[in-house]
Amino acid sequence: MFVQGENYKLYNGDCLDVMTDLIENGDKVDLIVTSPPYYNAREYSHWDNYEDYLLFLEKTFSKAFDILKDGRMCCVNLSVVIEPRLKRSCESKRIPIPFHFVSVMEKIGFKFLEDIIWVKPEGSAKNRNGRFYQDRNPIQYKPNIVNEYILVFQKPMKGLIDKIIRQYKITDNGESKIIGEYERSNVWYINPETKSKHSAPFPLELPSKLISYYSYKNDIILDMFMGSGTTGVGCMNTDRKFIGIEIDENYFEMSKNRIEESFK
């Protein structure tokens, strides 16, 4: 399914297929803001093993590399996930996806720029330190996980980034400037979304800031794992254009309705 509005294009399909078609059509985007499915941590992820998951990410972001303009940024929300223990005699395992992902992206050709730490309220985390709280044995200590990562990459370009800035008109530069308060460090305190029907929703504040910091007004933003459409709504709030791709029909319908309402 394909839905188009004045400032958005929404695709219900496999992101590899859709991005391939867009690339063959000569389409390019100015920024990517996305959150890939968690490895075996949500109901929509399905890989036989972790190596298959990393291969999926490599294939997906290789296409993203091709569709992204030279010198532009790709912002990816990822989290360390816990693989539950299968029986009491086994230990659970934390899988450091964000750290492995950097190697995947550098292999593709991206340049690593920033690691932004998204900190959520402590009450939003699953309790991991109950045993330690009771026994207080040092090697049993497990902190509650209240952070995720936003990893920012750049597609290499010839010359300095000033070359891109000069491509925009003076009015575009002025209207896109960040006025007032902004995030001064790489630690962002943002409450998670709680009302969304999506199982792993973006809080709107997160993509809205990334869009404002890494693109100009009327730029084209891509989210190939659109989910409930929060990146698209962020584009509406910041006067950008949006391309969204979602493979799940139910989530696509949810995001379509939400984005159509936002762009009215």
Where are these regions (language model features)?
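Core catalytic lobe of class I
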Residues: M1-M254
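Cysteine-dependent PTP/DSP-like catalytic domain, specifically the C-terminal lobe
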Residues: N250-K264
